[in-house]
Amino acid sequence: MIFNSTGKEKFIFSEPTKLKVVQKEFKTENGYKCGIVLEETIEASLTLRLNNKRIVRLKNLEA
């Protein structure tokens, strides 16, 4: 995705957003399921280029 506001500033998402989901289930002694652990990791990279001279990157956004 490329966004142009004035023709000089470009916001470029250079890397795709990654979503990682980990689920764990375990049974108790009497055979019932007693837990699910859900973990989500979102990784995004935002590259700001101003006149192709200055590059600012933001990485590792976790929620």
Swiss-Prot record:
Q: Which domain of life is it from?
A: Bacteria
What name does UniProt use for this protein? Uncharacterized protein RC0116
